[in-house]
Swiss-Prot record:
The lineage of its organism: Eukaryota, Fungi, Dikarya, Ascomycota, Saccharomycotina. It comes from Saccharomyces cerevisiae (strain ATCC 204508 / S288c). This is Glucoamylase, intracellular sporulation-specific. Belongs to the glycosyl hydrolase 15 family. Keywords: Carbohydrate metabolism, Glycosidase, Hydrolase, Polysaccharide degradation, Sporulation. It is an enzyme of class 3 (hydrolase). It catalyses: Hydrolysis of terminal (1->4)-linked alpha-D-glucose residues successively from non-reducing ends of the chains with release of beta-D-glucose. One of its GO terms (cellular component) is fungal-type vacuole. The gene is SGA1.
């Protein structure tokens, strides 16, 4: 039977939602593929039958740790949350800039250096990581109405010099054409090499730095900033050729080489690393196209983009595995040491798909594999973290890095929820909403029973009957009542993760790396820059959603 597109206007029955009222089921489209019977056939018993009112509902959530998230009539108690969000945003931005040199609070930090944390003992995080620094700078450029240009230029200057510095992996560029030394993840705050044993190389750093610097280049062009003669680059072309190009060369040369993951624990091939490498290459090709620059380097980049894309989506490489309906973060340890679930997969999706221009890249925010990864992280971590025990199934919870984590922020014992993981869940859902609203896209809900609709059936809707093994989809057309109420539900789910975080943040707004899974109190490295950055990311995309509604 050929593919059919069926519109059901004023379909028999009503769609009852958990907001104290019901609206007629109008402008809902069901795409059907090769069904033997129409879904309105009583004998089929599909999701929308003519046996009476449909019982598909939006899930309701009432209490979380004693805090009203929204009541049974859907009334959102947002005043306390809104007040806290505003205050926490202010604290987060202040703390981020305190952790960037030159800092009045930490004067030993060199200009342009972004420290991971001011903590120097138990644990010692008083270093600069290429990854953390790049993610922080990326957020500053993305979210600030007028980012501190001197901070950005100082960061570029640090990047320029680190690339040309020797480290334990090898000689810096300029001494050799080999880029292997760019895989060193960690440096001292005075820009000297960190020479102790560590998990090297980490191949995501150059990619993340490229992404951040390409965004700086765009800002400099748009703002007409005069670079002057203070630094070793006088134009955006210099910045690209002298910094970004070397990081891209590293990706071309080493993308298919093993390295340590972003948690610095496992040496192998990782979803996070590969997806951000793909993004860096893709954004660089956009740079060449926009600047109308030609280079033989471009064809190498195109081939690398093709190669990484193919590698990521090839089932043989294990990131997409028929056994699971979520993304496997590091396939080499799935099934043996871990489940493969990892918050880093959502971090990667959010980092890469922060704008519609990246929608052609795989694993976009609305990809069922991405959304189901969030669902499964919630499913696992709801039970392993006692502070989540009182949370309803359809509300946000405290999330950690991966279910098998044993790092407690000081040593090895029992893993805890992380601030950045919990904020990433919110960011993912806000991104999902923003994408559909800003681009006026319909909501597409998978209706097959191969578990690809787990996010929708377990977190958003109840009684969402599947349509068999064929690929059927429920389409909620943009700006219809069905669409709007579902978007509201997803927004409330996104907010509920921040409500959960709020319950464990002190009055001073300090964000450490983790919060204890039993007591809920902050622990691990204090004033973690990545924690503040992750909150800022969630806050900012939330504001963009509110402005677009």
């Amino acid at each position: 039977m050929a593919r059919q597109k069926m519109f059901y206007n004023k379909l028999l029955g009503m769609l009852s939602v958990g907001f104290g009222f019901a609206w007629a089921l109008e402008n809902i489209t069901i795409y059907e593929f090769d069904f033997g019977k129409g879904i309105l056939d009583q004998s089929y018993g599909g999701v929308f039958s003519n046996n009476g009112p449909s019982q598909v509902q939006l899930r309701d959530a009432v209490l979380m740790n004693g805090t009203v998230v929204y009541d049974s009539n859907g009334a959102w108690d947002s005043s306390a949350l809104e007040e806290w969000l505003q205050g926490q945003k202010k604290v987060s931005i202040e703390k981020i800039f305190e952790n960037i040199g030159p800092s009045a609070v930490y004067p030993s930090i060199s200009p342009g250096v972004v420290i991971a944390s001011p903590s120097q003992t138990h644990p010692d995080y008083f270093y600069q990581w290429i990854r953390d620094s790049a993610l922080t700078i990326n957020s500053i450029v993305s979210h600030s109405a007028g980012p501190a240009i001197e901070t950005l230029l100082q960061y570029l200057n640090v990047s320029f010099h680190l690339q040309r510095s020797n480290n334990t992996l090898g000689a810096g560029i300029g001494y050799t054409n080999d880029t292997v030394a760019l895989g060193d993840p960690k440096w001292n705050v005075d820009n000297t090499a960190f020479t102790e044993d560590w998990g090297r190389p980490q191949n995501d750093g150059p990619a993340l730095r490229s992404i951040a610097i390409l965004k700086i280049i765009d800002y400099i062009k748009q703002s007409g900033t005069d670079l002057g003669a203070k630094y070793p680059f006088q134009s955006t072309a210099d910045i690209f050729d002298d910094i970004v190009r070397w990081d891209l060369r590293f990706i071309i040369d080493h993308w298919n080489s093993s390295g340590f993951d972003l948690w610095e624990e496992v040496n192998g091939m990782h979803f996070f690393t590969l997806l951000v490498q793909l993004s860096a290459v893709d954004k660089s090709l956009s740079y060449f196209n926009a600047s109308e620059r030609s280079s033989p380097f471009v064809e190498e980049l195109r081939q690398t983009r093709r190669d990484i894309s193919k590698f990521l989506v090839d089932p043989a490489n294990g990131f997409i595995n028929g056994k699971y309906n979520y993304i496997v973060g590091t396939p080499m340890i799935a099934d043996t040491l871990r489940s493969g679930l990892d918050i880093s997969t959502l971090l990667a999706a959010n980092t890469v798909h922060d704008a519609p221009s990246a929608s052609h890249l795989p694993f976009d925010i609305n990809d069922p594999a991405v959304l189901n990864t969030l669902h499964h992280l919630m499913l696992h971590m709801r039970s392993i973290y006692p502070i989540n025990d009182s949370s309803k199934n359809a509300t946000g919870i405290a999330l950690g890095r991966y279910p098998e984590d044993v790092y407690d922020g000081y040593g090895f014992g029992e893993g805890n929820p992380w601030v950045l993981a919990t904020c990433t869940a919110s960011t993912t859902l806000y991104q999902l909403i923003y994408r559909h609203i800003s681009e006026q896209h319909d909501l597409v809900v998978p209706m097959n029973n191969d578990c690809s609709n787990a996010f929708w059936s377990e977190l958003v809707f109840s009684n969402l009957t599947t349509l068999g093994n064929d690929e059927g989809y429920l389409i909620l057309e943009f700006n219809t009542p069905a669409f709007n109420q579902t978007i509201q539900k997803i927004f409330q789910l996104a907010d509920s993760f921040l409500v959960k975080l709020k319950a464990h943040v002190g009055t001073d707004g300090e964000l450490s790396e983790q919060f204890n899974k039993y007591t809920g109190f902050m622990q691990g490295a204090q004033h973690l820059t990545w924690s503040y950055t992750s909150f800022w990311d969630a806050y900012q995309i939330r504001q963009e959603v509110l402005q677009s509604l």
